[in-house]
Amino acid sequence: MKVLIADKFEQSGIDGLKAIGCDVISNPDLKDEALATAIRDTGADVLVVRSTKVNDAALEAGKLRLVVRAGAGFNTIDVKAASARGIYVSNCPGKNSVAVAELAFGLILALDRRIADNVAELRAGKWNKKEFGKAAGLKGRTLGLIGL
């Protein structure tokens, strides 16, 4: 099975695919017409992307059977066009859950400490310690997280 990886991808993932017998072609710089050309020229069965957009032209360029988004969501893949061609589309939900949780807590702290406002004032040459020293902090607080 030929796997075309069209984005930056962990070497351990490439090694894992090779270990199970996949012929892996990795080119993290493929975009637009170059992606369609690579799909056609390599004869790839599987396309793996992260942020590369996979449009109708790319999907019709070869004999793909599966497009995998190495991340959550499908927002970079034309799922309707893939379905019309009998191409399966998959993603990897939850793979980035730790990074998302860490970012959420970083943003919570940034809001409490008004870091963005402080940076803007510092760049304007102002040091307003009194205003930006009023953080409530998180210690002893109950925090509710609401997700969609």
Regions found by a protein language model. Give the residues of each.
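Phosphate-binding beta-alpha-beta segment of Rossmann-like dinucleotide-binding domains, i.e.
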Residues: 85, 93-142
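Hydrophobic Val/Ile/Leu positions in short beta-strands of Rossmann-like dinucleotide-binding domains
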Residues: 5, 143-145
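Glycine-rich Rossmann-fold phosphate-binding loop(s) that bind the pyrophosphate
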Residues: 148
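An N-terminal-biased, well-structured beta-alpha scaffold segment characteristic
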Residues: 1-90
